[in-house]
Amino acid sequence: MFEIGFWELVLVAIIGIVVVGPKRLPEVVRTLGLLLRKMRRTISSVRADIERELDLEEMRKLMSDVDEPLKKHVDQLNQSIWQAEYDLRQGGKNLLKMIDEPPYQEPPPAAHSVQTDAEAYRDTGIEPADKSSSPEHHHDDAAR
């Protein structure tokens, strides 16, 4: 981490002896060692947190890339379901209307009535002859 060579360590030791004194130097070195270890742990912890955050950020980006098409498909499915539900409701309403309406009944067939000769002639537009002028009638009158 600190790429310190042999001569740099000798220089730091000489400065430490001059500043702190030979009696307190081992205690100061021990304290510096503890501080360096704590600093290294903190730095590695921060580094791990940053890497974890970067991984999380990548995962979020990946999820958002997957999420958009998935949302579109879900919206299309919802639209299809809503349309099917609407169609079913309309079909149900039409079915209920058909059930509520009376069924179509054909009008009863016209009664076949026997037409009299006069009615039949009237329908044709020809008038019947008098009974008195018919030959059968004359024959019956003469016989009497």
Curated annotation (Swiss-Prot):
Give me the segments passing through the membrane.
1-21
Q: Which family does it belong to?
A: Belongs to the TatB family.
Its biological purpose is as follows: Part of the twin-arginine translocation (Tat) system that transports large folded proteins containing a characteristic twin-arginine motif in their signal peptide across membranes. Together with TatC, TatB is part of a receptor directly interacting with Tat signal peptides. TatB may form an oligomeric binding site that transiently accommodates folded Tat precursor proteins before their translocation.
Q: Which GO terms describe its cellular component?
A: TAT protein transport complex
A Gene Ontology biological process noted in the UniProt record is:
protein transport by the Tat complex
Complex and partners: The Tat system comprises two distinct complexes: a TatABC complex, containing multiple copies of TatA, TatB and TatC subunits, and a separate TatA complex, containing only TatA subunits. Substrates initially bind to the TatABC complex, which probably triggers association of the separate TatA complex to form the active translocon.
Q: Where is the composition biased (Basic and acidic residues)?
A: 119-144
| Source organism of the structure | Dichelobacter nodosus (strain VCS1703A)
- Keywords in UniProt for this one? Cell inner membrane, Cell membrane, Membrane, Protein transport, Translocation, Transmembrane, Transmembrane helix, Transport
**How does the entry describe its membrane topology?**
Single-pass membrane protein
Q: Where in the cell is it found?
A: Cell inner membrane
Q: What is this protein called?
A: Sec-independent protein translocase protein TatB
- A molecular-function term among this protein's GO annotations: protein transmembrane transporter activity
- Region annotation Disordered: residue ranges? 97-144
Q: Sorted alphabetically, which Pfam families does this protein's record hold?
A: TatA_B_E
